[in-house]
């Protein structure tokens, strides 16, 4: 079965059934309707923290711009591995006119063990420096080969500088100090490589992440990190920072919607990215219906503190309600008959950002979309495990039929302790799902389309009434 063809047909048919929403008044500077978002990388891509953030943003912000999200990350991968699977796993997903590629690789190429005290004691500084320099040259050569293969096969290739290795956090995991300095050098290599090719653009993830991480640790303590406890894999906070770097780099849409009402003149002064109807000024209350063209971006509790370091809500999550000409006092805001907040006349005159109000029905809907994006992330990561197992065992498994492959992995599974939870779960998933690989692949575009359906904005009734 041609899995890619089958999944594309499913995605297209489901996307065509999307309901009509408010007129969208903004667009992406990087994606177009019908694009494939092909994310290539190692476990940081495969595990999906930043891919989750990107997917959630684009589906909530531009729910009428259908993007086919494809996770092409593999745990443990490096430049050599990407080159090996280029023809079989990567390029078949790309389309020269309809795809935007993302490439981030380097964490494993940096060979973190080179920065351990044990390695330094064993080799001595001169020999170790020579080894690191040689390895850097290998990375430059292979990264160039990868870029030269992908760039001609996609409309745009976005090259990330490698995400940070947290070498400044005071946490239990052994610190291979110097790894992130090497990743910075890798980033310079990437930028130099990109200069030569017109359709390759760079996002300096490492700079943004280490800047925010440094501010976080300076203000909240060295035991804080936007990376996971292993110093390598970003959790949602890290993915959130990566999203912010992406949005800044491409000047992506800032607004959910804007509504400006002049209460004194009883007029709608402005509406952006929303359709306003049934505006009334009766019995001391202001009421109207709003159908927005977007949803607010739902920020996980674990990452809310990061807004102070990035100003994400101010810059990229603006759902503004501004009402001037009100009498001084306090006002209750109701949406669909439920109180969602209390604001002063001054706050309303200045404009309140409802995207940060977790009580609104729009935010609740966005949280539902996010949960579905998490489900997509999990399914994609599990599916990528099948490819990862076969890539890591290719010298043996390439010679086997499907039953032989399953038997081989079953032996690996039986030898793997549950304490090694990642490989235990990966082998288990492989054994249970290898014969259903096509079905598992087909589930992803179906879910992708379902998420877009869940993200279609709904009309809501607003009512503002003076309370004191």
Segments the model singles out, each with a brief description of its role:
Residues 1-6:
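Positively charged n-region of N-terminal signal peptides that target proteins for export
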Residues 20-24:
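Boundary at the C-terminal end of the N-terminal hydrophobic targeting segment
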Residues 7-17:
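Bacterial N-terminal signal peptides
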């Amino acid at each position: 079965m041609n899995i890619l063809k089958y999944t594309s047909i499913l995605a297209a048919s489901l996307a065509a059934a999307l309901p009509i929403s408010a007129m969208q008044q903004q667009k992406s500077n990087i994606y177009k309707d019908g694009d494939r978002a092909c994310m290539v990388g190692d476990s940081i891509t495969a595990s999906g923290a930043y891919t989750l953030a990107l997917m959630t943003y684009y589906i909530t912000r531009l729910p009428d711009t259908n993007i086919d999200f494809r996770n092409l990350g593999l745990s443990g991968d490096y430049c050599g591995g990407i080159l090996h699977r280029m023809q079989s796993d990567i390029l078949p997903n790309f389309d020269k006119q309809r795809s935007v590629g993302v490439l981030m690789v380097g964490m494993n190429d940096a060979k973190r063990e080179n920065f351990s005290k044990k390695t330094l004691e064993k080799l001595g500084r001169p020999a170790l420096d020579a080894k690191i320099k040689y390895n850097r040259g290998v990375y430059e050569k292979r990264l160039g080969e990868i870029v030269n293969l992908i760039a001609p096969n996609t409309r745009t290739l976005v090259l990330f500088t490698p995400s940070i290795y947290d070498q400044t956090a005071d946490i239990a995991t052994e610190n291979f100090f110097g790894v992130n300095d090497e990743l910075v050098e890798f980033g310079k290599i990437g930028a130099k490589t990109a200069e030569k090719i017109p359709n390759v653009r760079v996002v300096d993830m490492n700079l943004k992440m280490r800047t925010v991480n440094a501010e976080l640790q300076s203000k909240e303590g060295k035991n804080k990190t936007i990376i996971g406890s292993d110093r390598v894999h970003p959790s949602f906070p890290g993915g959130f920072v990566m999203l912010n770097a992406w949005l800044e780099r491409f000047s992506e849409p800032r607004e959910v919607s804007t509504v400006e009402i002049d209460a004194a003149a009883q007029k709608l002064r402005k509406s952006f990215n929303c359709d306003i109807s049934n505006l009334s000024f009766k019995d001391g209350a202001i009421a109207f219906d709003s159908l927005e063209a977007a949803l607010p971006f739902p920020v996980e509790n674990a990452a809310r503190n990061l807004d102070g370091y990035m100003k994400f809500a101010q810059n990229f999550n603006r759902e503004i309600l501004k009402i001037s000409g009100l009498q001084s006092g306090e006002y209750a805001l109701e949406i669909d008959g439920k109180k969602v907040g209390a604001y002063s006349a001054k706050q309303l005159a200045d404009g309140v950002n409802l995207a940060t109000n977790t009580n609104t029905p729009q935010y609740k809907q966005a949280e539902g979309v996010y949960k579905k994006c998490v489900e997509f992330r999990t399914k994609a990561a599990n599916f990528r495990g099948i490819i990862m197992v076969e890539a890591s065992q290719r010298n043996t498994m390439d010679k086997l039929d499907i039953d032989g492959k399953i038997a081989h992995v079953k032996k690996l599974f039986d030898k793997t302790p549950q304490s090694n939870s990642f490989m235990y779960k990966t082998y288990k998933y492989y054994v249970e799902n290898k014969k259903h690989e096509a079905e598992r692949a087909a589930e992803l575009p179906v879910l992708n389309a379902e998420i877009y359906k869940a993200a279609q904005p709904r009309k809501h009734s607003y009512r503002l009434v003076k309370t004191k």
